[in-house]
């Protein structure tokens, strides 16, 4: 598995620490990271994403990952104003055979 960590706050730093050789790079537009945007990371370099960003940034990144067939572990909460959006994301993930999982781990 080749994993990128998006969001280098407390959870992103913790998750990076445990990835070992599976870690590819970090992405964060506010903090020191390898890239400031996920779109700059070469798609062939990874197959999974650990998403540890604020809620207002999650949907766009999730959609990008699903479109590009990248598996996702989303740090909770995954708060969205409309269940329709969640249902649509789930359908797209299934269609693209992408694992989309929300978790809470400390």
Task: Give the residues covered by each predicted segment.
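N-terminal Rossmann-like dinucleotide-binding module
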Residues: 1-33
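Alpha-helix boundary recognition
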Residues: 17-20, 42, 94
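Local beta-strand N-terminus motif with an aromatic residue
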Residues: 23, 46-49
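Residues at the C-termini of beta-strands that transition into short coil/loop
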Residues: 27-30, 39, 104
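Short acidic low-complexity segments
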Residues: 33-46
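Beta-strand-loop-alpha-helix segment that lines the small-molecule cofactor/substrate pocket
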Residues: 48, 59-104
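Substrate-binding/gating loop at the entrance of the active-site cleft, primarily
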Residues: 54-55
């Amino acid at each position: 598995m080749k994993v990128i960590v998006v969001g280098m706050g407390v959870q992103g730093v913790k998750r990076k620490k445990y990835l070992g050789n599976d870690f590819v790079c970090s992405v964060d537009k506010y903090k020191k990271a390898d890239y400031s945007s996920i779109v700059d990371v070469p798609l062939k370099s990874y197959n999974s994403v650990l998403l540890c960003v604020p809620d207002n940034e999650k949907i766009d990144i999730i959609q990008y990952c699903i479109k590009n067939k990248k598996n996702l572990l989303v740090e909770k909460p995954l708060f969205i104003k409309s269940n329709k959006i969640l249902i649509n994301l789930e359908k797209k993930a299934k269609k693209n055979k992408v694992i989309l999982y929300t978790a809470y781990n400390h």
